[in-house]
Each structure stands twice: as C-alpha cells, then as structure tokens.
Amino acid sequence: MSCVDQIVKTFADLTEGDREAAMRAFSMMMRTEPVRQTPAAKKKVNGFMSFRSYYSPLFSQLPQKERSPFMTILWQHDPFHNEWNFMCSVYSSIRTYLEQEKVTLQLWIHYRVRHLGVIIRDNYMASFGWNLVQLPNGTHDLERTALPLVQHNLQPMNGLCLFTKCLESGLPLANPHPVIAKLSDPSYDMIWFNKRPHRQQGHAGQTYNSELGVSALFPCNHAVAAAVDGITDLPLSHWLQQGDFGTEAGFSPQFETLLDSILENGNASINDPYNMALGMGVPMMG
C-alpha cells in the first residue's frame, strides 16, 4: 500500500470530529510565513538633479522642451559642482529619515544653500552673466555677457556639521536624533581636502585640477573634527567633499604629516585644536 493510500485509509477511519482536527493540524504545519518584501533602495540623488530642481523655476515661463537644454547649459558651466555633490551625498544618506517627516529634496536644498556659498536662485543669472534672449522666430536662447571670477569660501564641513547648521536655520525635523546618529558614524564620515583653480573656465567648458586628494576617517568628536570646526576660513583653494560620489588621486607629504600629528595626539581637548593651517604651511585667515 502506498503512502498516499495509507493516509487516505487513516482519514477514512477517523470520526468526523477527529478528521477536522487532523486537517487543522496539517494546515498549521504547512502554513508558511508571508514573504516580507524589502523596499527597493531609492536611487541616489546626484548634483545635477538637485541643481535642476532648485534653478528650474528661473525658466518657468518656458515650455519644458526649451527649459531642459538651458538647465544643462547652466550646469555645464556652473562652478559649484562639488558643493552640489556634497549636499546630495549627505541627503542621499539620510533620505529615509527626512522623508518620514515630509522633508523633501526641495526643502532640504532651501535650508542648505546658504551654508555652502552657492548662489541663490534669484541672483544666479546676473551673478554669472547669463541673459535669456528671445530670437526672431519666437524661441529663446541663453547669452553670456560676462565671465566672473568665482571664489569658493566653503568652510571645512562634514555631513553632521551641514545638518546641524540646517537645523539651526529652521529645518523642520521633529526627531533629528536618528539622523545625528547616522552622520556621527565614523564609517560614514569621510573628509576630503582638495585643491582646485579659483577661476571659472571659458564657455567651452571647465576643468578642475585637483592637486591633493587624501581621505581620512574620523569620529565627529575626534581632534580632527575639533580642528576643522575651529578654522574660520582656509585659503580659497581648500574645500571639502563627503560621500561616495568620486575619488581623487594624489599625495601630499604635508597633509600626511598633518594627519600623523593629529592622530598621535588623538586625546587632545576640543578646546585645544591642532592648528591645521600651520601644519599645512598656509596662513590662517580670521
């Protein structure tokens, strides 16, 4: 007798009540947990996406087919790519927490623009010499009448510092503690010092020549963080990136010496920060 036949015979010999109880027992044994679907990871926001979101209203009177090429042109000649990428790297890492409290990308940009030296929307066209002109056929074009010098006064800043400044400016976040914990994680907090030219290149394009690219991981309460926070203004050639949107090749003995000195004195008080400008052989600027 096959196993199936044996099971059928066994059930046939049971009373109706026992048969129902056995069926319930079998049903419980065969029940499986529902498959939990993990939400798909959202695509990281890049610099151009946020740039377009912020400045697109400059051309709100134009149809989309005209507006999009103009945004591409402005982005190609914008000197603040690294600031936009830095902001987006921070946003992408804390996006889940921000969206839980209805903080949109547009709202995040609104509160962070003032802290990164980026030109505000209303002043953008005039600041970079752009004019929107109407052609005889009724279409529009961008005309550039000036190529200004661009100075980057970005103070050394990490993701936690940027987020804190946004909170101080009024970013509406009822529970900032999970974000602070995320940005305080030393495995996330990466500081890159780089050097790039101060002048925006010609209409044909622009090139950033990084002379120094060294990354280092530090907890936010490390002496490095204290030193960075204590500098009021490094020379304009120094700026900071954070995140995983790119890497730079290069080596600087001066910067390596600086890091070694700080690491050797890792227990230094935050009230006695290491003089980074002195370590790098550059003057402090008050």
Swiss-Prot record:
One of its GO terms (cellular component) is nucleus. It holds the Pfam family MATalpha_HMGbox. It is found in: Nucleus. GO terms for biological process: positive regulation of mating-type specific transcription, DNA-templated. One of its GO terms (molecular function) is DNA binding, bending. Keywords: DNA-binding, Nucleus, Transcription, Transcription regulation. Residues 40-95 bind DNA. Belongs to the MATALPHA1 family. Required for expression of the heterokaryon incompatibility and sexual functions. This is Mating type protein A-1. It comes from Neurospora africana. The gene is MTA-1.
